[in-house]
């Protein structure tokens, strides 16, 4: 789909407030409308203006955030760490095939204290009708089988340890030894597989960042619903391959 790179940044930007998006521009497409609504909801879901103008959408939330920071500083006092607060948002078109498009949302916030917080999430949108897929791309049995696959993926690809015990030592939840938790965040389709995302503090300490692992499509083939399989088959079409060649990892 056609997009336009747009940004909003407060000037002067003492608060470090910036929002950016690869904004869908085809007003006649149902998938465009669904992606725009998703962006609006990711930012708070309170903007009531037309979504045809992405710059106004970003300006609304950027201004709202900057004004809130100023009010907080005035209430708490000027000599606080909030004087160097930051808010950064970026919506990216991460992957596209002839049948679906993946968008990601990256948000970083800092309002004083030892460190800021960041989040990563996304959505997989079917082009034909705009339907957004998340965990429902997998069957119920498929999701249960994913627990062990994700655990092994995190062990070898993210934490880079050799044993389950070494992995458990890096996690916050002792129960992960018995039932490995699935991420609360919906999985997203990338050029080389499905990415599974845990947010900060969800399963590991802050120092671990955002634990993720990407499992190749062929390893998940029998776990997808029949609804999702045609979309997965499109991950090797000509449009998909313009993003990256298929990589096994």
Features from the language model and the residues they span:
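Compositionally biased intrinsically disordered regions enriched in Thr/Gly
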Residues: 1-249
